[in-house]
Amino acid sequence: ASDVYKRQKPKIVVIGSCNTDMVVKAGRLPVPGETVLGGTFYMNPGGKGANQAIAAARLGAEVTLISKIGYDLFGLQALEIYRSEKINTEFIFTDQKSPSGVALISVDSYGENSIIVAPGASRSLSTEDIDKAKSKLEEADIILMQLEVPIETVEYAATIAKSYGKKVILNPAPASVLSNSFLSCVHTILPNRIEAEMLSGIKVIDEESAWRAAKAIGEKGIENVVITLGKD
């Protein structure tokens, strides 16, 4: 029975960023030029790609993460964490010239945060790296992507995935201008209201405008459009 279960595990490839989140909690966030004495400090794996990969692996999928790290302590620690989460790290490449990505996050007592991301090696994930992982794209059931790695790399991977008849799920964040040729390779897209407005040209202010924006985005050749509205 266990063999049957293993065969039924969905194979998911995630193409995206991996960062180390460095988080400090404080009573309030500092204003420019101010120093605030904080409380708790901790480090977590972060980056939209790594977050998706960890979540999918914990839900029982067979996950491969395609990403890039620097040859440094943060990168090596990230690899250990991904392996402990049963993620295939075979295609996490190392950039000898760039540091691993980090995010500096300050959080106040209400949960409001301010974040600065230094993407580092994530920004050098290339089309050549995707070529090295083509066999995994061909085996995959689903390919997850976001836009914290170069858009030309993601678009190249989406084109290959479509040629293999694979379902591409795109989280179009950070908000960016995307070509119709790229969007036509996407099966499911998950924009927030700002990203939906950028993709559709329709300002999303309520449920009715969200429906209109979703319809306009769907007309670009995307089968499923899911617009997230935050706390609404």
Where in this protein do the model-derived segments appear?
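Short, small-residue-biased leader/transition segments that mark boundaries at the very start
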Residues: 1-5
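Glycine-rich phosphate/adenosyl-contacting loop at the front of the ribokinase-like
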Residues: 6-68, 73-87
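Beta-strand->loop->alpha-helix junctions that form or flank phosphate-binding loops
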Residues: 15, 40, 66-71, 89-100, ...
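Alpha-helical segments flanking ligand/cofactor-binding loops in enzyme cores
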Residues: 54, 79-80, 155, 159, ...
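Active-site-proximal loop->helix
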Residues: 73-85, 103-107, 111, 129
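Short gly/ser/thr-rich secondary-structure transition/capping motifs
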Residues: 86, 123-128, 168-175
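Conserved phosphate-binding/catalytic loop of the ribokinase/pfkB sugar-kinase fold
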Residues: 90-95, 105-142, 147
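Conserved phosphate/ATP/ADP-binding segment of small-molecule kinases
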Residues: 158-232
